[in-house]
Amino acid sequence: MMTLEKFEEASELVKKVTNPTKLVFSEYLSTQTGAKVYLKPENMQHTGAYKIRGAYYKIGTLTEEERNRGLITASAGNHAQGVAFAAREFGCKATIVMPTVTPLIKVNRTKSYGAEVVLHGDVYDDAYQYACKLAEENGYTFVHPFNDLDVATGQGSIAMEIVQELPTVDYILVPIGGGGLITGVSTLAKMLNPKIKVIGVEPAGAASMTAALKAGEAVELDSANTIADGTAVKEVGDQNLPYVQENVDDILLV
């Protein structure tokens, strides 16, 4: 269950490994929309993305025994680097399963944080299934990229920073892949100020959250086609869906 106490704990914990990402006013977007538009530059984090937040908080909630067993995850990029970086900070071993088509630069960056990288399968789903197999065979602790409420709580620390810096915020727009980010951000935003509108932005060619909301449950798409590979998820997390149903006001397809 996601609680304000856990969000506050996560927000303090992730400060140890995140860079301050102050809101940046966009004159161009503000002119185009007729509103005051600010950007949250999470690309300025150590690993180049917000994923370090969820990975670090999740690993921080684990017992010493769970960490000592070694961590494992599957990812084609940002979550891989987030888990690798966080595992290094906690002094534990991490194994990252990545698709064989993962760009070499992402593989090398993940390795640079001390993780063991295993290349398997052509797509994320292949890598994920193999990671689950390795976790079962070796007793590793799995750190899911999005279908985990502790991971989502860590990502939600973004909302804490937005509201603290801009208390008058009316709308928060959040990209959707598997649903972890928008689960955390929307839930905390509504806790802090129920008047805030949270709008999801999802690829039209990988609209797995839209499909889940229509069906009332997580469903698997036949394919996920989008240039935004970080949001190319065929099935959203079933743990995330109830929070999205309750806290997200609308989803835009692009």
What are these regions (language model features)?
Residues 1-254:
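PLP-dependent amino-acid enzyme catalytic core
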